[in-house]
UniProtKB/Swiss-Prot annotation:
The lineage of its organism: Bacteria, Bacillati, Actinomycetota, Rubrobacteria, Rubrobacterales. It is an enzyme of class 2 (transferase). It comes from Rubrobacter xylanophilus (strain DSM 9941 / JCM 11954 / NBRC 16129 / PRD-1). Belongs to the Thz kinase family. Catalyzes the phosphorylation of the hydroxyl group of 4-methyl-5-beta-hydroxyethylthiazole (THZ). This is Hydroxyethylthiazole kinase. ATP binds at C118, T162.
Length: 267
């Protein structure tokens, strides 16, 4: 689904997007969801997550601040989402940095029907079984396109490897998204927020196919470009990013001709 159509549908339906995410970026993630046009809920208690996912249009799982109880909540929510057939989006934050994170990402992928995975080049390379260097939650180098292609093929789902250029692969397609701004890399949680936007678009489309994911990332990157104009630094940029997400979602026609999504080749 293309950005304009997704944003119009979000404005009409206001679907609930259920996040089980990390406590570092939870506020930014919730606000990015709201500004995009969906309704965020940040429920993580094991006792209620299945019920909450049962009312949602999409589920977004983020392992940024990981513990065993949270993993059990993610599995319970994911099973409920799978029963209802709603999209499940995974952000494998820090996969490759520690054994726990790598193992947890693998467990979620093996026990749940995940619709799309969004991460940096190092995280995606780790899931694809490629050599990768991940320091903390940051990727150090790596070929994002190669990682996305390999992971999409081996996992059998949509994979987005984000960076200066985002590569979205799946179903024999490979797309490149060139929207964005370097200041996005100066704000902690911007990657989490971009995955949240993917969840919003997936809720609108009812799926997380490569085109839907690519246009979600292009919309987010376009908001980053707009926010950077006049921003004094990372602090003002973060506030302006939310303003830009809201402005573009309120008037999708402003995206016309601005989204840079192209074919990245499939081999």
């Amino acid at each position: 689904m293309r950005a304009g159509e997704a944003l119009r549908r979000l404005g009409e339906r206001r679907p609930l997007v259920h996040h089980i995410t990390n406590y570092v970026s939870v506020g930014l993630v919730a606000n990015a969801t709201l500004c995009t046009g969906a309704l965020p809920v940040m429920a993580h208690a094991r006792e209620e997550v299945a019920e909450m996912s049962g009312a949602a249009g999409a589920l977004v799982l983020n392992i940024g601040t990981l513990d065993e109880r949270q993993v059990e909540s993610m599995l319970a929510a994911g099973r409920a989402a799978n029963e209802r057939g709603i999209p499940v989006i995974l952000d494998p934050v820090g996969a490759g940095a520690t054994a726990l994170r790598t193992r947890t990402a693998g467990r979620l992928l093996s026990e749940l029907e995940v619709s799309a995975v969004c991460g940096n080049a190092g995280e995606i390379a780790t899931l694809a079984g490629l050599a990768a260097e991940v320091r903390g939650v940051e990727s150090i180098g790596g070929d994002a396109r190669e990682a996305a292609l390999k992971a999409a093929s081996s996992l059998g789902l949509t994979v987005a490897a984000t960076g200066a250029v985002d590569y979205v692969c799946g179903g024999g397609r490979a797309l490149a998204v060139e929207n964005g701004h370097p200041l996005l890399g100066r704000v902690v949680g911007s990657g989490c927020a971009s995955t949240a936007v993917v969840g919003c678009f997936a809720a609108a489309a009812g799926s997380a196919d490569p085109e839907t994911v690519a246009h979600a990332l292009a919309y987010f990157g376009c908001a980053g470009e707009e926010a950077a104009r006049g921003a004094g630094g990372p602090g003002t940029f973060e506030a302006r990013l939310l303003d830009a997400l809201a402005a573009l979602s309120s008037d999708p026609s402003r995206l016309s001709g601005r989204l840079r999504v192209g074919d990245a080749g499939a081999g």
